[in-house]
Amino acid sequence: WNSLGLADSSVMDTPNIDRVGREGVYFRNAFCTTTLCSPSRASILGGLYAHSHGVVNNFTEYPVDLPTFPRQLQKAGYQTAYIGKYHMGEKNDDKRPGFDYFVTHQGQGKYFDNVFCFNGGERKMVKGYYTHAITKMAVDWVKNRDDDRPFLLYMGHKAPHSFYYPEPKYEHAFDDVDIRYPLTAFHLEDNPDWYKARLDTWHGIYGPIFDYRKEFPDRRAQSVLDFANMVRAYRGTIKSVDDSVGYMYEFLKSIGELDNTMIIYTTDNGLLEGEHG
């Protein structure tokens, strides 16, 4: 959350996301009930806690017998589309219930030249940067919809998920920003030993940090440089998402639908930038 200008970030400038929040409602104290990706996505889809919908890991499908808000809108006459990363059922890119148009891919997808599956049928590589690719597909779908019916467009960005690959435009956007380990990274006295041991593992600040550190664990003072490069790349990917939000905003405005459209910007979870180890 602190990588948004709207959240009083001292280093991030996200004017388009900020505009949505300032012109609408900004939930400053909203919290994710289950911080793992797929369980959280399932909760957004169906409005249930993880212990109710049963998606408790990143490999489980959302149960087809449970309701979802897209299915309800579809029943009410809405045109519905999902475009982007779905991430429930790791190897499944089939079309899901509740969507008239469904474009996704298996697993996490790739930042560049990703292979998408269209409506559970044809798979093809879409050249270019993921964020811009799904934005263009979203615009094309809205242009070709039935103007006489309301619509739901659900976009699933890959960014800013690891591994972090900013587009060239933002690859060096934060090179001059000083980044250090947060102070809370070392406030571990009240935590059990197994927790402290995780500092040297995949998600710990002394671990590989998404491949930005080649030799690990590394507790040397200079290893903070690897951490800093990871955070800079992470923030670079966010800038592209902000551009996408701005493009969709201006597009809706250009076709006269901005004031007739509810724009919801949310996420399945957030990244700890070294906080609490």
Residue ranges of model-derived segments:
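Formylglycine-dependent sulfatase
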Residues: 1-277
